[in-house]
Amino acid sequence: MRFQSKQYVRWGDLDAFGHVNNATYLVYAQEARYAWSKMIEMVVARAEVDFIAPIYVGDFNLDIEIWVNKIGTSSFGVTYEMKNGDELVAVVKTVQVTVSMDTKKSRPLNDAERDFLNKYLEN
């Protein structure tokens, strides 16, 4: 199963070339991830972006699909496909690490988190 999200492209997201700034793709991924999994206390340990096609200001609605690509003991991988209509414009991959908000240290995934993530797991 994949989580579906929409992201609005704002004027402030553009760079001097008139397309969405490269750093903004990670903001889009973050917004979609939060809507999908706000129940999990986590931090980003790694992020990578494959830029496939530029996004311009006229491309106001970006469709983002999210799924889990790996589940470990205290971390999991997430893939985000970003599309403008039918056109794939970027693929973002992150590694998330679950943390304790009290100790600020990594901790193992609990059963509820693991069950949630398994619903979105694609190998």
Per-region residue spans from a language model:
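Terminal targeting signals and extreme-terminal segments of soluble enzymes
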Residues: 1-61, 69-123
